[in-house]
Amino acid sequence: MLDNKFGFKQRVASLRWLSAAIMLSVSAVPAWAFSIDDVAQQAEKLSQKGFEAPKSNLPAQFRDMKFADYQQIRFNNDKSYWNNVQTPFKLQFYHQGMYFDTPVKINEVTATTVDEIKYSPEYFDFGSVNHDAEAVKNLGFAGFKVLYPINKADKNDEIVSMLGASYFRVVGKGQIYGLSARGLAIDTALPSGEEFPRFREFWIERPKPNDKHLVIYALLDSPRAAGAYRFTVYPGRDSVVDVQAKVFLRDKVGKLGIAPLTSMYLFGPNQPSPTLNYRPALNDSNGLSIHAGNGEWIWRPLNNPKHLSVSTYAVENPKGFGLLQRGRDFTAYEDLDDRYDLRPSGWVEPKGEWGKGKVELVEIPTADETNDNIVAFWTPDVLPETGKPLDIKYRLHFTRDEDQLHSPNIAYVQQTRRSAGDVKQSNLIRQPDGTIAYIVDFVGPNLKELDESTPVASQVSIGDNGEIVENNVRYNPVTHGWRLTLRLRVKDAKQPTEMRAALVNGETTLTETWSNQLPANE
């Protein structure tokens, strides 16, 4: 009896302790946590209502200012958000001005609260720009940037910039801003005109002291779409952004661009400058790379065409695609001011199966380097029904290590060079013959392993607008790879000419596919 009573009391005590422990653990778990579902609820509600165009509250003085004046408005570094919080991440904000004339709402998310970060003119140094502090006191921000000690432990540098429509830029260690990513592209290059969705509101999680990543939520809105986004930024040698998106269509669209990248290409070795220029190349990216679902790797050198050009690549369940800057030697660019050799490549790594669709490349004519004239994205063959969410997940890589962005088992295109075609005469003088020549160097570990006497051959095809008059493959002792020389004759110069090539050894494919376009009127 004594043992039984003691056992009973012990069990009661144990139950009381367990009950207290459960209550303690429940109270330790936040009753509420912000997530993409909260943003998705707003996006879905927006999609069920008519679109309300954002209204500008910007005084004319700021809207009409020139770029040089806008540059004078600088954020006060000593007022960086989270300056007094134990975290390596800091926030700074963009002032409205010029075409950045619509405010976005920016919120801070903590474990228990969501609070708007209010605009104040005290955040900014206006330089010589005269302004009425009273007129701008409730102006709102144009966007924001994220700072992090990515290059030096004692120095905060920009790693993320979110400014304008749904554009954002990201850099890793030792990189400078180049190409941009976007949340969504709608009807790009269609005759009806492109629609530019915009991020209208952001929620930024306050990072914990030891966090090495930053979480940003965004609400996207446009006349025919609304969406919720979650960006998880991992700064590093290669900065990585995990993207989760839930998109709701308000109305039918002609084309939906998923994971769009935007860049600039003015000229390069495959399309030399029409005027004398000491720079061998001037571009943020020089090619589109695609890793198709069937395992094929494709490299498409970029062009600056005289007319709008759209190239499509049917890709089911893509493994990756991106706009790359291949070739990192300073001598490839020779620009001390803009350092195109330090600009990152952007690579999209889809998560899960995206289904049937196309990678689309849009090339737009530009006369100078101030215009982004290159767009690449994946577009699904079957668009989501109006009101039903399209769930997309992918990872963005911003890197200068292009070697990781192609298969180690096949060679890749190191460079593409274009020139007037010629034929060496009996007197050893080269005589132009009216053709166009392409020099394509393939390199890679698998080619280095081959003896130079290996019978490497080419598989080449050309569209109806061209004729191959020379197809020559030879060992390149400088690169320990193989060089392909193609000379082609164009039938109608007013039309583009498409060509493809790869190197093989018997039945074995040795290289990625070089997919090239000679633009019209070149």
UniProtKB/Swiss-Prot annotation:
Protein name per the record: Glucans biosynthesis protein G
Keyword Signal listed: yes
One GO CC term on file: outer membrane-bounded periplasmic space
Pfam families, per the entry: MdoG (PF04349)
Biological role stated in the UniProt entry: Involved in the biosynthesis of osmoregulated periplasmic glucans (OPGs).
HAMAP family: MdoG_OpgG
Pathway(s) served: Glycan metabolism; osmoregulated periplasmic glucan (OPG) biosynthesis
Tree of life domain: Bacteria
Residue stretches spanning the membrane: none
Lineage: Bacteria, Pseudomonadati, Pseudomonadota, Gammaproteobacteria, Enterobacterales
Main location (coarse class): periplasm
Alphabetical list of Gene3D superfamilies matching this protein: 2.70.98.10, Immunoglobulins (2.60.40.10)
Gene Ontology process terms (BP): beta-glucan biosynthetic process
Secretion signal, residue range per the UniProt entry: 1-33
GO molecular function, one term: catalytic activity
Protein keywords: Periplasm, Signal
Family membership noted in the UniProt record: Belongs to the OpgD/OpgG family.
Subcellular location: Periplasm
